Structures are given as structure tokens and as C-alpha cells.
Amino acid sequence: MQTQLKPLLLLTPLVLLSGCSTVSQIASIIAPDDDPTRPAREVAVADAVPKHEPLCKYGNMPSYKVLGKSYQPMRSAVGFSESGIASWYGPNFHGKPTSCMEEYDMYKMTAAHKTLPLPSYVEVTNVENNKKVVVRVNDRGPFHEGRIIDLSYSAAWKLD
């Protein structure tokens, strides 16, 4: 397992018609999976394009429990802000269902968050190099102490 730490990332969910709002978060990146070979196609992966979407049928339950800890997903991200660590997830989850019951693709611009409404759109800025990406939050996690968001492999790679 390879670990990469980055000093700071700024995460800002984008304001849309409903359910999303401005969110500020500070984070570092930790790589939980083996680092796959970086395919050339990743450079061309476009950021997620924010659009109004209904909440996912799955993943937005009033509460859920993982590893003995309870979480209450938000119905709206209005006024939300948080700081902490970001990690990325890749090959170990590639092709498996997300909390929205969509197939996880580590080469798309997606992310997982414990409580943001699914889906939400988040702008992530690496404040060390000012690189920014926009991701679509469609999964729950990370369920590791101190981590606030899991980025797809492509999202993390584009921020590096």
C-alpha cells in the first residue's frame, strides 16, 4: 500500500438549484489502495459537470451505522463546512456498486462522503499547487478515523 500525503486541499461543494451549497473543507490526500499505473487517458478526464439531480434512491437514508458509528446524511449541504483529510480509492473498489447503486469507476471524477447528500458536486482545490477539480459525490465513506472524503483515483491524480 502506497501512501501520499499532501499538506492541504480546499473542498467546496458547488451551489445548485437544490440540495447543494457552499462547503469549505481542508484536507490531505492519503492513498489507501495500491497505486495503479497511471494511464495516459487520465489526463483527458474532464471534471464532473454540476447539474440539478434528484437525490439517489439509495444512500440518503435518515441514518446508517458503519463499524459501530452512526451517521445522519444531510438533506441539504447549505451552510456546511468541515476540515480534515482526504483519501482516494481505486482498484479495490473499481467496478463495485456505490451507495447510489452506480458502478464505481476509478477513472471518473467522483467521491465519497459520510453525510453530504447523494449526489452532490464538490470543487476540490489542492492549496499547495492550486490545482482544482470538480467531483460528483455518489458514495459513502471514508470510514477511517480523521478522513472526510474519498476521491476517485483520477480526481486525486489530477490534484497531484
Residue locations for each model-derived region?
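Bacterial N-terminal signal peptides that target proteins for export
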Residues: 1-9
